[in-house]
Amino acid sequence: ITPDMDWQRFFRFKALLDRYQVKPLIGVVPDNRDENLRGSSESRKDAPADFYAYIRGLQEEGWSVALHGMNHVYSTKKGGLFPLNDFSEYAGKPYEEQKEMIARGKQILEEHDVHTDLFMAPAHSYDRNTLRALKENGFQALTDGFGEQPYLWQGLTFYPISFRLSDTLKKKKGYSTMVVHTGTIQENELAGYE
């Protein structure tokens, strides 16, 4: 989520989560430069006056927060280790650049007293340099993994994501991270989640 996103859609989805007492993991983009994540001025009118105070409040309610990149801008045409997309904010960039981007994103969150050791890669794309940079910056886990259970690899815990939500919801066992882009969610999708 971002300070400049479509808050009306977010609050509608949050009401659904609250109704069913779901405490989600959310990805926070500390310096959003992705126009696709920005809501209209009308949809931002209900935005919290202090974005980071709001995020801290969600954490106090039991929500988990992940660093969701730095700017959420796809500047490479690399998919990295997770073959879902062929573009990335991180994959394909030199280690030092990735390390600096991750450090800066974490610093922005911590300057606002938001602390996390979870990472959510924009476009689910990362490479070995990303993993190394995450560990160097104190991260313990990321959301973009395979399978049905969290697992340890390269010194990090990976939480599996759902490739096809309908298939994931039919499973009788296992764990998965559902990806919901609340800023662009449509009415029929809201009804489906209900």
Give the role of each language-model region.
Residues I1-M5, L37-D46, F87-E96, V179-I185:
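The substrate-binding groove and active-site-proximal loops of carbohydrate-active enzymes
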Residues I1, V29-D31, M70-H72, F146-G147, ...:
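Active-site beta-loop-alpha junctions enriched in small/polar residues
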Residues V73-N85:
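Short, flexible, mixed-charge acidic loops at enzyme active sites
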Residues P3, R19-Y20, H112, N137, ...:
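Catalytic grooves of carbohydrate-active enzymes
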Residues I1-S64, I108, H115, A191:
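Active-site beta->alpha N-cap acidic-glycine motif
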Residues P24-I26, V65-H68, T116-F119, A141-D144, ...:
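Hydrophobic faces of well-ordered beta-strands that scaffold small-molecule active sites
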Residues I1-D4, A66, M70, L84-D86, ...:
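Active-site groove signature of glycoside hydrolases
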Residues E89-R164, E187, A191:
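Catalytic domains of cell-wall/extracellular-matrix polysaccharide-remodeling enzymes
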